[in-house]
Amino acid sequence: MSASSITKDIHAVGILNPAMRIFDVVMKTEYGTSYNSYIVKGAEKTALIETCHLTFFDQYLDNIRQVCDPAQIHYIILNHCEPDHSGVLARLTALCPKAQILVSQAGSLYLKNITNQPSLPITVAKDGDQVDLGGKTLQFISAPFLHWPDSMLTWCPEEKVLFSCDVLGAHYCEPYTFDTNMAYPAKYEEAFKGYYDAIFGPFPSYVQNGLTQIKALDVETVCNSHGPVLTRGCRLEWAIDRYDEWSRPQKNEVPLIPIFYCSAYGNTGRVADMLRAGILEEIPHADCQIYDINAHDINFLQGLLNRSDAFGIGSPTINADAVAPVWNLLSHVDAINNRKRPALVFGSYGWSGEAVPNLTARLKGLKSNVFEEGFRTIFVPSEEELQKAKEFGKRFAQSLAK
């Protein structure tokens, strides 16, 4: 991707990475991604907004040079300091001797540890601060937890362009700059939703705050950090509406209490059945279904768990631990919004029975309200033990009303 123009004085100089399939270890990126970066030229000064991943330094530098000499850059603005935004910074600053680096207060702390260069020429950009490039003003808007504590937005009122950082972005790569040229809009929408869920899903209240700030501006163009540039009359309004819809507080119509489990020989599954029976005896209107983790898509189960009012999770003990699919599901727990969510842990074991206490410890570490110390049976549960499981489910349901 070579440099392209957003407006007469704003240019996209970012990088396409269509081959990326995993981002930040855990995010699948079926449609690749882009590392968006922009140059804003005023009559007197030039600003570079965001940089890119270190892997692409040479190509990125060539894109910058298509627009300006790096030595003529006065400001390097990082709306967010994650390495996909700041990766080339340490090398780039050597070519930009007059450039001041503008970041948020939190960003100034992160950047020193990301670059290991404590002498970088960093200036903290506070909420409401601005720089004048000569006919072009860049105003800074604090946007913490969208999606890091350091995040901010940069607004150019003269051009009605918002540099939105990761907000309204997507891990999606087509060889076009604008949303008006997308060849596969359905795939983009899929990537947009997946990106929101993974990046912003844990922060709905902050998303609402950010939308309030964005809606107060007369935005015609959103230059985000990943995916196509969004324009008024095409995808911009749609994207804002989706964020608004997805981040609004939602209450389940009936109590949602899913029970997730894995079972080697069906014994943990039998316990799950009885726990469900006990829960429904106390809360008959609850949506309490049982899900064999190996039989369902992990993303579906993740969404269900994170929407739940309470949940159960069960595992046999194999090799002195819970089994891998159960740990995999818990690795997708929204650790921020899961705090104080009631959880019930159960399982059958043959020898030592570590699965239940290990899962209990993990959920307590996530600040879940784990019910008692869980429920365990040895090998095949007897009828008496199954009745105890049902009573355990009833007591768990009763605890939800307290």
Residues of each region from the PLM?
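Active-site-proximal loop/helix segment associated with metal-binding centers of metalloenzymes
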Residues: 147-151, 159, 167-201, 246-252
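Active-site metal-binding motif and surrounding structural segment of the metallo-beta-lactamase
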Residues: 55-102
